[in-house]
């Protein structure tokens, strides 16, 4: 076990929306230190979202935040060995981990989509998540279903 808990790194807000959440998302999206490319992909995706949902009164950023909320899991299962048997124990997720999981899932399922550019794939996944559909939303539902199925083992807290 480590001696001291590491300090939280300060993440600077992004240049366009002045939002830390956007910076975190772009950091997850980034490959090989190419942050400018990640920003371009993200902003292009938000533009595409705005053009595909023109009658929505919310801004593209608000749509993205709602999509993130829709794919954010509240509970997960962790493996715990008790007397030779391994149980899947449902546990609540810390707020920072919730955010991280939702961002990673949104990006993962956007990357898995076929064909087009990453900006288009990300935009499509954001729209699906906003409408409570798509791979990232399904992953969240599966996590919740798994926790519900293993509710009997909730007393094996960590």
Swiss-Prot record:
Keywords: Ribonucleoprotein, Ribosomal protein, RNA-binding, rRNA-binding, tRNA-binding. InterPro entries: Ribosomal_uS7 (IPR000235), Ribosomal_uS7_bac/org-type (IPR005717), Ribosomal_uS7_dom (IPR023798), Ribosomal_uS7_dom_sf (IPR036823). One of its GO terms (cellular component) is small ribosomal subunit. Coiled coil: none annotated. Pfam families: Ribosomal_S7. It comes from the Bacteria. GO terms for biological process: translation. GO terms for molecular function: rRNA binding; structural constituent of ribosome; tRNA binding. Belongs to the universal ribosomal protein uS7 family. One of the primary rRNA binding proteins, it binds directly to 16S rRNA where it nucleates assembly of the head domain of the 30S subunit. Is located at the subunit interface close to the decoding center, probably blocks exit of the E-site tRNA. Part of the 30S ribosomal subunit. Contacts proteins S9 and S11. This is Small ribosomal subunit protein uS7. It comes from Phocaeicola vulgatus (strain ATCC 8482 / DSM 1447 / JCM 5826 / CCUG 4940 / NBRC 14291 / NCTC 11154) (Bacteroides vulgatus).
């Amino acid at each position: 076990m480590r001696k001291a808990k590491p300090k939280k790194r300060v993440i600077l807000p992004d240049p366009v929306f002045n939002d830390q959440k956007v910076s975190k998302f772009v950091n997850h999206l980034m490959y090989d230190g190419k942050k400018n490319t990640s920003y371009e992909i993200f902003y292009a995706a938000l533009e595409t979202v705005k053009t595909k949902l023109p009658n929505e009164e919310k801004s593209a950023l608000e749509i993205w935040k709602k999509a993130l909320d829709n794919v954010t899991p509240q509970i997960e299962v962790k493996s715990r060995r008790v007397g030779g048997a391994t149980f899947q124990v449902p546990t609540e997720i810390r707020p920072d981990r919730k955010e991280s999981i939702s961002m990673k899932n949104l990006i993962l399922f956007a990357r898995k989509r076929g064909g087009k550019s990453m900006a288009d794939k990300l935009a499509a996944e954001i729209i699906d998540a906003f409408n409570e559909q798509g791979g990232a939303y399904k992953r969240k539902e599966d996590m919740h279903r798994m926790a519900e199925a293993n509710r009997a083992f909730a007393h094996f807290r960590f």
